[in-house]
Amino acid sequence: MTLPKIKHVRAWFIGGATAEKGAGGGDYHDQGGNHWIDDHIATPMSKYRDYEQSRQSFGINVLGTLIVEVEAENGQTGFAVSTAGEMGCFIVEKHLNRFIEGKCVSDIKLIHDQMLGATMYYSGSGGLVMNTISCVDLALWDLFGKVVGLPVYKLLGGAVRDEIQFYATGARPDLAKEMGFIGGKMPTHWGPHDGDAGIRKDAAMVADMREKCGPDFWLMLDCWMSQDVNYATKLAHACAPFNLKWIEECLPPQQYEGYRELKRNAPAGMMVTSGEHHGTLQSFRTLAETGIDIMQPDVGWCGGLTTLVEIAALAKSRGQLVVPHGSSVYSHHAVITFTNTPFSEFLMTSPDCSTLRPQFDPILLDEPVPVNGRIHKSVLDKPGFGVELNRDCHLKRPYSH
């Protein structure tokens, strides 16, 4: 089989600072009013009264969704979405295009390495540039799968299990249990600036959910980089009587010594997890060395599927789990091939967590959601990532080349 070359790469965006809030899509923080994801969740900005109540108040949704499409000489296309918006469009159209167009559709690792090397001087260890590279990488995998007529998970070597089981992230673990999920992860609402009173309030929330969900349903806390080691340690011990399964991302990404200390201090049997806001393989190697139990890369932010596969191998070599942050189909096709990912995350994007809504709604068509907390591998059997771009969304292409 002669594989075609890539003829075009294009980048669009939706949402972000120039749009009405609530666009959704790849920037899942960009939701409308009265949504749990924007309701007094503890953040690094919570210590400032003006930015305590709402994450959108400090601009969590200003980037918007980046959509990258790659087109082969034969007219077939692949695409992906991430969080990078208009600035990501500029990087794709004005810089990364030179490493993509003219390459064979199978040259994914070559393109990936060239994108990383060429942006190293302005990318740092993650953030906007890495989100953009991730989006390109995912689009390339989607195109390759569609050209050869295979789902991405089969390109990676095939499934190691028949289905993926999920826990749900949202404000209502009790509703998640009714929907068949294996656990529920709640955001914390208080931080170090709230003192011991904040610890008591979040521990009371866990206690209330434990009573509602029973003794065996998993309960976890997502702290979203909002704490310090002392506060996180005290919170973990306050929640231990309620069988908290893990405490997640308590500290900013680069506080590796803090994660090492927190793991030493955590109650016996309670896991410490992080990784959502780490980018690059090197940062995950350092994170793994802290001894945390689960690494949680976001495939749309860490360097794409190419990097996620490397992170999973790194974690496996150390006996650690890798459970990616959300990411819908882009994670599904990876984790069903990983032996060290026994479960995965589903992010509840309905406002009150009472219904199942696709994570990247409305930008993806045919995006699957779990049934009774699970997705069978047969659901993933369409070529590429198995979804299509919703071109009825108001796509903007601000740059070209």
From Swiss-Prot:
GO biological process, one term: carbohydrate catabolic process
Disulfide bonds: none
Catalysed transformations (reactions): L-rhamnonate = 2-dehydro-3-deoxy-L-rhamnonate + H2O
The keyword Protein biosynthesis appears for this protein: no
Active site residues per record: 325 (proton acceptor)
Residues involved in substrate binding: 29, 55, 345
The keyword Magnesium is assigned to this record: yes
Site for Increases basicity of active site His, residues: 298
Cited SMART domains: MR_MLE
Other comments on record: Reaction proceeds via a syn dehydration.
Similarity section: Belongs to the mandelate racemase/muconate lactonizing enzyme family. RhamD subfamily.
Oligomeric and partner information: Homooctamer; tetramer of dimers.
HAMAP family per record: Rhamnon_dehydrat
PANTHER family the UniProt entry points to: ENOLASE SUPERFAMILY, MANDELATE RACEMASE (PTHR13794), MITOCHONDRIAL ENOLASE SUPERFAMILY MEMBER 1 (PTHR13794:SF58)
The protein, known as: L-rhamnonate dehydratase
Species annotation: Salmonella newport (strain SL254)
